[in-house]
């Protein structure tokens, strides 16, 4: 959409958002009409066709763009979670600023003429770190999450007494745009089946929000038994490959009267590192939607726009083995990770138009894309060389290794250090018993990288060393479990490592603040560190480069690199794992880049091995499946100091 047209549309929608907040709330209602199996909005029959978008996966400056595209697609509502850990990073410390400004997002939804279906948890899944629960809950190691454990309920009550009053003015009957609120999330898939816990939550919602707001639950068909609760409207979730008739028939056993609701109709699926990129065919998704709409059902499409797991926010599953989720949350959704309409969107819009009016006019085109590079990175230094800056308070000492949670390290990395108590001449097995590495350990002896020990593997490393040799183990938290009957997912070294027949003790733990180093120290002129002859293991690389023209959205491609973390101008883009796949590029929104000759800085923490030429490129198309062949556009080997982004920039789309 051209900027002028976008501005006009927003000005037309502005009166609606203001109207939503006017004190005429007593005439507004959203209720279940059980006699006619439907919803009523202000007394009139109503059916929502909704889509999921997560504000915490989309930078704030892009909220309006994504929401307007959803409205133009024919949706009349959006559904989204509220991740507790995103807003209460430490007990009693709350953050609702910037991209965490929930009220601003509700207002943007109102500007786009979208009603809201809110899912505040406390547990959300969402393939998000620890399912949205804050990891500081695990500082009490015996806590039972998602149960009526008094410690857990006390933390939930404290959080909801902050959150729910904020959203109270935005309830539909109060003049806002929130028509319904979900209690918990797919609780029937959890092992506890604690109805006392669910009743406590329902009572808390009612006490803080009143009796008028519609409260509901969502579960897969197998979870309805433990997930539903009297007094909460029961909904179900399933995808296009599932038997709609069978599932809705089962739903009627729990909710005999009222509208049929699929709260998560899957337009795609998530990706795990090491597995193929997931897709769902356009024909299957559109056919399933049309069949549900013919039944009069209300439907939310999960996801309509997936977004990105920036930083360390991805979650993980455990299906026989630990499965961390990729940085991209594209989800094969109707709106791509970069915010572009896909063929799936146009097909879904055609289906929706058969059942309700859709906004007139063409959908906005794809955003401009940019190509740049290759950019040659310079070696900054080994991670161990910056230890004083990474952990300015110094180490924590303990006989046995301590977990991330015990030392209050929520995300990222922690270094464990001990010293060899005797000389080892022959290669000697090193391992951590009982799968006690959560999640990946990068092992070094006197600064020399030895290899990796990880959560899913039983392989051992073989080490040698002298009396007093320094044994360093950098442990990476790859994301806490986010779904299902998961137990508490502690991170770090859960068991003391063993070298030969010796249990290693006398540990120092260094909780690392890598983001602070990248953001505040690396822009300064740091002293020169001695470079290793053949760098391997956890090492920083960096490069400043100008973009001479205007900027566009782009995708960072790291051919030959192994695994690590990337920052652009101090912003943590997230993890790359080129060697594992399927994701090969990282989405870089254009607002992160400085145009017209200003210097940009890219920083990599490569954890294992670097390519012979430490180069990266910025592409105009993503590569989300490593098994697919990249259509390579010829890139001239110009240095980043002279390449103008305005020349190779072109629109990418359909």
From Swiss-Prot:
Entries under Pfam families matching the protein: BetaGal_ABD_1, BetaGal_gal-bd, Glyco_hydro_35
Organism expressing this protein natively: Homo sapiens (Human)
Extent of the signal sequence: 1-27
Family: Belongs to the glycosyl hydrolase 35 family.
Broad enzyme group: hydrolase
Cellular component, GO annotation: extracellular region; vacuole
Keyword line: Glycoprotein, Glycosidase, Hydrolase, Secreted, Signal
Main location (coarse class): secreted
GO aspect biological process, one term: galactose catabolic process
Catalytic residues, chain numbering: 186 (proton donor), 264 (nucleophile)
Recorded GO MF terms: beta-galactosidase activity
Function as written in the Swiss-Prot or TrEMBL entry: Probable glycosyl hydrolase.
Family matches, as InterPro entries: B-gal_1-like, BetaGal1-like_ABD1, BetaGal_gal-bd, Galactose-bd-like_sf, Gly_Hdrlase_35_cat, Glycoside_Hdrlase_35, Glycoside_hydrolase_SF
EC number(s) given by UniProt: 3.2.1.-
Listed name of the protein: Beta-galactosidase-1-like protein
Subcellular location: Secreted
Sites carrying sugar chains: 97, 243
